[in-house]
């Protein structure tokens, strides 16, 4: 259980509550969650963040009407900057997108600008939006995370409660290494509903070698942990930086979609460019 799970800032969210679905445009459906909720317990403030990054969203269920009433469909790509005051709560995002369904817009650019404006207002930060026609995406192969997968280890695990203990004394040797490690076993739970969130994670670092067994045990310990996707990624980045002290670190997770949306946060203190192709489970 997260220390802020019952924080009053979460009381007004539609997440976990019965809601009506509206199909006419309504920007008020969007709801933000202060990033400070999980950053404060980690000792992170807006002026001392040890990373840069973004939350990358893919919008698979995006439709509206053109000026003549003909339905349009697109796949949206949204990038929400890490410096925004709020993250976007995903159920409210879904409800907001549904409100486009029976609304007429003159052009695709009007839709893009509307999304960008509303998301910026909710997040209180910088947001970029791209819309893709389906033929732009057809035939694209399923992507994969570059790196060494650490999942196929012959180990026994019986603890699924979150702990940073595994990262203590998790580095060895004085030699600096540079490697990229991947796991598809990341599973956490929604902060509010406790529904499972499934993800793959890529950890790229330069520093003393990190013990792969201990790192995997740490990642598996998220299995009963309740936090939003973005919060988990920041926690993982902060914990590895704190206990393993790499010179450079990048953490990137791609989660399976829910409600027509997938969320793919990344945080880095290096020159990191995230690959945005969907993975096998997305």
Swiss-Prot record:
One of the GO BP terms on file: tRNA modification
The protein's enzyme class: oxidoreductase
Residues that hold NADPH according to the record: 90-91, 258-259
Superkingdom field: Bacteria
Keyword terms, alphabetized: Cytoplasm, NADP, Oxidoreductase, Queuosine biosynthesis
Species classification: Bacteria, Pseudomonadati, Pseudomonadota, Gammaproteobacteria, Enterobacterales
GO cellular component: cytoplasm
Family per similarity comment: Belongs to the GTP cyclohydrolase I family. QueF type 2 subfamily.
InterPro entries noted in UniProt: GTP-CH-I_C/QueF (IPR043133), NADPH_dep_7-cyano-7-deazaG_red (IPR050084), QueF (IPR029500), QueF_N (IPR029139), QueF_type2 (IPR016428)
Its EC number(s): 1.7.1.13
Catalyses which reaction(s): 7-aminomethyl-7-carbaguanine + 2 NADP(+) = 7-cyano-7-deazaguanine + 2 NADPH + 3 H(+)
Chain positions recorded as substrate binding sites: 88-90, 229-230
Protein's recorded name: NADPH-dependent 7-cyano-7-deazaguanine reductase
Pathway the protein contributes to: tRNA modification; tRNA-queuosine biosynthesis
SS bond partners: none
HAMAP family: QueF_type2
GO function terms (MF aspect): preQ1 synthase activity
């Amino acid at each position: 259980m997260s220390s802020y799970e019952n924080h009053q800032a979460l009381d007004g969210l539609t997440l976990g509550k019965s809601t009506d679905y509206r199909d006419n445009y309504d920007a008020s459906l969007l709801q933000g969650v202060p990033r400070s909720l999980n950053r404060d317990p980690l000792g992170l403030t807006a002026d001392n963040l040890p990373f840069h990054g973004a939350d990358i969203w893919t919008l698979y269920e995006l439709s509206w009407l053109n000026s003549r009433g003909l339905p349009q469909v697109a796949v949206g790509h949204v990038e929400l900057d890490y410096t925004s005051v709020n993250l976007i709560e995903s159920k409210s995002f879904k409800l907001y997108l549904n409100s486009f369904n029976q609304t007429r817009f003159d052009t695709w650019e009007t839709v893009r600008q509307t999304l960008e404006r509303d998301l910026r207002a909710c997040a209180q930060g910088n947001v970029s939006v791209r819309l893709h026609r389906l033929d732009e995406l057809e035939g694209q192969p399923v992507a994969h995370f570059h790196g060494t997968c650490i999942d196929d280890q012959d180990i026994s695990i019986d603890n699924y409660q979150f702990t940073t203990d595994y990262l203590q004394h998790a580095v060895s040797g004085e030699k600096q290494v540079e490697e990229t490690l991947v796991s598809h076993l990341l599973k956490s739970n929604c902060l509010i509903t406790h529904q499972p969130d499934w993800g793959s994670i890529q950890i790229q670092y330069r520093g003393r070698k990190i013990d792969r067994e201990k790192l995997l045990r740490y990642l598996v310990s998220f299995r009963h942990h309740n936090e939003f996707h973005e919060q988990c990624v920041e926690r993982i980045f902060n914990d590895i930086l704190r206990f393993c002290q790499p010179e450079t670190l990048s953490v990137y997770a791609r989660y399976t979609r829910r409600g027509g949306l997938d969320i793919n946060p990344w945080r880095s203190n290096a020159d990191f460019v995230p690959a945005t192709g969907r993975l096998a489970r997305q």
